[in-house]
Amino acid sequence: MPIAKVHRIATASPDDVSGLAAAIATGAIAPAGILAIFGKTEGNGCVNDFSRGFAVQSLQMLLRGHMGAAADEVCLVMSGGTEGGMSPHFLVFERAEGNAPEAAPALAIGRAHTPDLPFEALGRMGQVRMVAQAVRRAMAAAGITDPEDVHFVQVKCPLLTAMRVKEAEARGATTATSDTLKSMGLSRGASALGIALALGEVAEDALSDAVICADYGLWSARASCSSGIELLGHEIVVLGMSEGWSGPLAIAHGVMADAIDVTPVKAALSALGAEAGEATIVLAKAEPSRSGRIRGKRHTMLDDSDISPTRHARAFVAGALAGVVGHTEIYVSGGGEHQGPDGGGPVAVIAARTMG
């Protein structure tokens, strides 16, 4: 029976794969079992954040040395931006085989890749449907049949550049936007609605091109979408609970109502029978509230011309969550279009369950 393992590895720079290399060398991680790697890299998290691609390239070089062509199947999801005290790190998701003493259900991992997304489909229903189909494939790969057993879906999605817009126009097509920064939000939003569609959180007849990044009453409680320049398709990882997996690890999720709402994290830990600590894995989304207020108090994250609002939000939310779990290697991704309510966002906790 498969056993899910999650390894959190600190990095000294985006290309620092020495920790992963050492874990492979000592046998702590079997490269053949690596399904996905999430990373927080120290870039700006915007269009011109090449720290993500730098990390992906470095990881691919290492993995190909151990896995050959199979390395291309590993989902590499790099999220740029380690603002505030957030510490750069990798999360390595591994599938092992064995007979764990812990009874099922347990943490299950599934992954899927999509073909390259036509540039004119980005931020439109074509992207929504492409992501929804891939989420369903990833669920099947994880052995999850009930969408209620899915607790977190991570999607790495593409963005538009000036050259990509021109390429579409040369074919007689039009893109949803020519603003490259805005394209990041549209891509995240369409991907999130694709997740919501796959999980039954939003009905397909409620969706159209017009609602993407417009009707924020439509959102997923389990979506985390990160856009980047380093890919043209989507890489999708589903994390949930399955009777077909065993082992000590389990996952639970909640939705933060705002940037300082840490109650869902505590509730998730309680649901797992786990305590906060160094071993706790936290995955979260962050987005400044569009109202410009947090519990009635004014914030200035939307008014800073020097620093992107998503960068402010990542730092703020990571600090709040670090205070709960007691460490700063937290995966907080910025840009929460259709990912949780305005100013809040999905959060998931992975921890070892208390035996007995």
From Swiss-Prot:
One Gene Ontology term of the molecular function aspect: metal ion binding
Protein's UniProt keywords contain Nucleotide-binding: no
Chain intervals for the UniProt region annotation (RU B): 106-243
Site (Important for substrate specificity): T310
Activity regulation annotation text: Inhibited by barbituric acid.
Superkingdom assignment: Bacteria
Enzyme category, top tier: hydrolase
Binding site for substrate: R52, S79, G80, R188, S226, S227, R314, S333, G334
Binding locations of Mg(2+): E287, G336, Q339, G340, P341, G344
Xref: InterPro entries: AtzD/Barbiturase (IPR014086), AtzD/Barbiturase_RUA (IPR043008), AtzD/Barbiturase_RUB (IPR043006), AtzD/Barbiturase_RUC (IPR043007)
RU A, as annotated region: 1-99
Protein EC: 3.5.2.15
Pathway: Xenobiotic degradation; atrazine degradation; biuret from cyanurate: step 1/1
Subunit structure: Homotetramer.
Domain comment (free text): The monomer structure is formed from three repeating units (RUs) that share the same structure as one another. The monomer, the active site and substrate all possess threefold rotational symmetry, to the extent that the active site possesses three potential Ser-Lys catalytic dyads. It is possible that any or all of the three active-site serines may act as nucleophile (albeit only one can do so per catalytic cycle). Mutant, bioinformatic and structural data propose one specific dyad being involved in catalysis.
Record's function text: Responsible for the hydrolysis of cyanuric acid, an intermediate formed during catabolism of s-triazine based compounds in herbicides such as atrazine and polymers such as melamine. Catalyzes the hydrolytic opening of the s-triazine ring of cyanuric acid (2,4,6-trihydroxy-s-triazine) to yield carbon dioxide and carboxybiuret, which spontaneously decarboxylates to biuret.
Full protein name: Cyanuric acid amidohydrolase
